[in-house]
A protein has these predicted regions:
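Short, hydrophobic beta-strand segments
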Residues: 36-41, 134-153
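Exposed beta-strand face motif in extracellular beta-rich ectodomains
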Residues: 42-46, 88, 154-158
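Beta-strand-rich structural segments
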Residues: 49, 86-103, 109, 159-162
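Beta-strand-rich extracellular modules
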Residues: 51-53, 163-167
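Edge beta-strands of extracellular beta-sandwich domains
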Residues: 55-67, 168-177
Length: 178
């Protein structure tokens, strides 16, 4: 059995696996501050729902079982950068063949930048990681990392590429304008 805890968002909560109830409605535990269920592990989408007294869902949070790491997915907060020393943030994720983030992934990602920009750093948010954040290689933490890209004053297209052994790589393109 595995324990699946949830924090309080309402007085009652239930647990669903692929839309079917696997954890009956439970009240908030004043002593621990946590509602939890012990259930056998099964692959799928696990959803905790905070409910009112009538059983209507008021809030919820889902996680999905992932497969093996397959590819790198990158999403930028913007694709047009105006001016010198403007910073863009790129969220980099290791995903399975279905596009689900592999939370257990700790792959090392290499970043290269082409064009009028430079890599400021890579950050995985792992407090125990003492590696150089300004290096162009970094391990993902819980399947994710954040890349900081800064313009260098020129105009044109910027390509930011992400690669890792055995994973399908990706790239993000920016347009730099003055």
């Amino acid at each position: 059995l595995h324990s699946f805890p949830t924090r309080r968002s309402s007085d009652l909560a239930r647990l669903l696996l692929d839309g079917k109830v696997v954890g009956e409605m439970k009240p908030y535990d004043e002593k621990t501050g946590i509602i939890y269920w012990d259930i056998p592990f099964r692959v799928g989408e696990l959803r905790a729902e905070g409910c009112d007294k009538e059983g209507n869902a008021l809030s919820g949070y889902s996680i999905r079982t992932s497969g093996r790491p397959y590819a790198i997915c990158a999403t930028a907060d913007r694709t047009i950068l105006s001016g010198d020393r403007v910073t863009a943030h790129i969220t980099v994720e290791v995903v399975d063949e279905e596009g689900t983030v592999v939370k257990l992934g700790d792959n090392e990602i290499t970043c290269t930048v082409e064009g009028p920009a430079r890599l400021l750093g890579l950050e995985g948010s792992d407090n125990s990681d003492m590696s150089d954040y300004t290096d162009n290689r970094h391990r993902v933490y819980h399947g994710r990392l954040l890349a900081y890209i800064q313009t260098t004053g020129g105009e044109g297209q910027v390509k930011v590429k992400f690669a890792s052994p055995l994973l399908k790589g990706t790239e993000v393109k920016f347009e730099v304008r003055q």
